[in-house]
């Protein structure tokens, strides 16, 4: 059993050493594109035209 543990330790040690010493490449941050101009405008007023079309029924 002791020999098995030693064998596992010897096999895992190079992986640990390589994992700790290798440097990961970091990609540059890409700026997102600016939003289109129509997104920055205020929303259209749909309430006023709809009030002229849809009105509550008259009480009679």
UniProtKB/Swiss-Prot annotation:
GO biological process terms on file: viral release from host cell by cytolysis
Lipidation (N-palmitoyl cysteine): 20
Cell division recorded as keyword: no
Subcellular location: Cell outer membrane
Major location category of this protein: membrane
Signal peptide start and end residues: 1-19
Lipidation, S-diacylglycerol cysteine type: 20
Membrane topology label: Lipid-anchor
PROSITE patterns on file: PROKAR_LIPOPROTEIN
Keyword entries, A-Z: Cell outer membrane, Cytolysis, Disulfide bond, Host cell lysis by virus, Lipoprotein, Membrane, Palmitate, Signal, Viral release from host cell
CC annotations in GO: cell outer membrane
Highest rank taxon of the organism: Bacteria
Pfam family, one: Rz1
Record family assignment: Belongs to the lambdalikevirus o-spanin family.
Reported function: Component of the spanin complex that disrupts the outer membrane and causes cell lysis during virus exit. The spanin complex conducts the final step in cell lysis by disrupting the outer membrane after holin and endolysin action have permeabilized the inner membrane and degraded the host peptidoglycans.
Note, other: Encoded by the cryptic lambdoid prophage DLP12.
Subunit description: Homodimer; disulfide-linked. Interacts (via C-terminus) with RZ (via C-terminus). Part of the spanin complex which spans the entire periplasmic space. The spanin complex is composed of spanin, inner membrane subunit and spanin, outer membrane subunit.
Protein name: Prophage outer membrane lipoprotein RzoD
